[in-house]
Amino acid sequence: MTTPLSSYSTTVTNHHPTFSFESLNSISSNNSTRNNQSNSVNSLLYFNSSGSSMVSSSSDAAPTSISTTTTSTTSMTGASANADNQQVYTITEEDSINDINRKEQNSFSIQPNQTPTMLPTSSYTLQRPPGLHEYTSSISSISSTSSNSTSAPVSPALINYSPKHSRKPNSLNLNRNMKNLSLNLHDSTNGYTSPLPKSTNSNQPRSNFIMDSPSKKSTPVNRIGNNNGNDYINATLLQTPSITQTPTMPPPLSLAQGPPSSVGSESVYKFPPISNACLNYSAGDSDSEVESMSMKQAAKNTIIPPMAPPFALQSKSSPLSTPPRLHSPLGVDRGLPISMSPIQSSLNQKFNNITLQTPLNSSFSINNDEATNFNNKNNKNNNNNSTATTTITNTILSTPQNVRYNSKKFHPPEELQESTSINAYPNGPKNVLNNLIYLYSDPAQGKIDINKFDLVINVAKECDNMSLQYMNQVPNQREYVYIPWSHNSNISKDLFQITNKIDQFFTNGRKILIHCQCGVSRSACVVVAFYMKKFQLGVNEAYELLKNGDQKYIDACDRICPNMNLIFELMEFGDKLNNNEISTQQLLMNSPPTINL
């Protein structure tokens, strides 16, 4: 027979204890709060474990009797003590059954002022099951805190106190697994997991409730069986975390000038409003005030697009997709109207020091005699001279690239204008082919005699036209050619005529001088174009040949530096030599074959 265990310490005596009804009443009245529940439950456990028979010897009944500090004054004999003990057990059984029924009815309704019975940990007589990591189970001890505070009492008949109860699949293992499952479900908490509902049958505060610490939880016990035979499962143990909860929208944005109270009044999310600084009205204004706002205030903040560049006059196409239209001073483009553009007139109004003149000499004025002799060599009539002068003047005026400044403070960039301080040929002209073709800078600055050469080609508009100083001019034998190029001129159309003239004099063994202002850009492009045509070279090969030279036939001209516009013109010239239908410039600039500006 198993001995029932009590939650309070008991004292075993060898003599027969004295007992009286007065002492029983005093015990129940003084210790009803602490040990009434424990004694009744232990007594009931004793009778359930021993069966329906209540007959026991005096030696068995003596250790299980409850010993108190009060001493009975009435002495009994051994025979009467046994009879009295049986009556005590009968009375105790009836009291315990009544106490259990009464506590089952009142277990779910705790009075507000009632304080649950708390037992010290040292009074536990049952060992805690292993593997729970100090987890306080409500089933391991009948009088635990969780069973008294948060759950209904469990029927003692369903609890197995066998030493091997951990091996049997009973209700204890089922409840333990269910609680472990509930712990695993609620361990991982995130921002979208709704908290578990609070227990309604507990009066203790839950402010210090920690989800991640299972040792500090008080998990309610599932009531597996009752008198009615119905099963109840706590919904909080099997609750799945809500991971599909839609996050709330961000709070509505507060307006820049609106009242602070209007922020929380609206729950609908709104997009940021239009900036009030541009419209000059506050967010609290009414709709009528906004509609009555003048359009002149909004027009002040309107972005004005920039003006079109000079090379895209009267053009509907994008300025970035059309190259500048450059004109040669040797001829006149008949398709262009001879008129001053509105941009040029606006330049004259804004700048007082800007004039539109032909840069044929150093004083930026037109030399009528030289321009007439260049275009009409065989005509000496004054009317023809005036017509030719007007034609050249109108051609230059129609190209806005030829705007020049008379101010002495203005200095053009080096890539657009050669500096006169460059002295690329301190030892005189450079031999660029078989001592017949020479490259040099302005001969007026170098003080050399141009009459020693059979052909002189001047391709710089900054240099003076020295045709009057060149003596004994004979066609195809002794000539002076003046072509006023700028750094942005379209030289590809003139290179065929110039290279043919050079090849003609070179074949006859005559000396040729090619020069510009510094001899490193425009005149160097003429020599490169001659190499391309004479030796059938590309632009890169011809350029490297002139720059590095040849030890026997060509001197190295390492100071040459044509700008990118002239390089593109050389590529255009190479395309024309190869009879290409689409030029390189058209491919690079993505422009159509003909452009009407």
Curated annotation (Swiss-Prot):
Keyword S-adenosyl-L-methionine in record: no
UniProt signal peptide: none
Enzyme class: hydrolase
Comp. bias intervals (Polar residues): 107-126, 169-207, 216-228
Catalytic activity of the protein: O-phospho-L-tyrosyl-[protein] + H2O = L-tyrosyl-[protein] + phosphate
Chain spans, region Disordered: 55-88, 107-228
Gene knockout outcome: Derepresses filamentous growth and decreases virulence and resistance to cell wall and osmotic stress.
Residues in Tyrosine-protein phosphatase domain copies: 428-579
Comp. bias regions, Low complexity: 55-81, 136-151
Keyword annotations: Hydrolase, Protein phosphatase
GO process terms (BP): cellular response to starvation; filamentous growth; hyphal growth; negative regulation of filamentous growth; negative regulation of MAPK cascade; negative regulation of pheromone-dependent signal transduction involved in conjugation with cellular fusion; signal transduction
Any one Gene Ontology cellular component term annotated for this protein: nucleus
Active site residues of this protein: C516 (phosphocysteine intermediate)
Pfam families: DSPc (PF00782)
GO terms for MF: MAP kinase tyrosine phosphatase activity; MAP kinase tyrosine/serine/threonine phosphatase activity; protein tyrosine phosphatase activity; protein tyrosine/threonine phosphatase activity
EC numbers: 3.1.3.48
Role of this protein: Protein tyrosine phosphatase that acts as a repressor of the yeast-hyphal switch. Plays an important role in virulence. Negatively regulates CST20-HST7-CEK1-CPH1 filamentous growth pathway. Represses hyphal genes such as SAP4, SA5, SAP6, and HYR1, by acting through a CEK1-independent mechanism.
Family per record: Belongs to the protein-tyrosine phosphatase family. Non-receptor class dual specificity subfamily.
PANTHER family: DUAL SPECIFICITY PROTEIN PHOSPHATASE, DUAL SPECIFICITY PROTEIN PHOSPHATASE MPK3
Name by which UniProt lists this protein: Dual specificity protein tyrosine phosphatase CCP1
Organism: Candida albicans (strain SC5314 / ATCC MYA-2876) (Yeast)
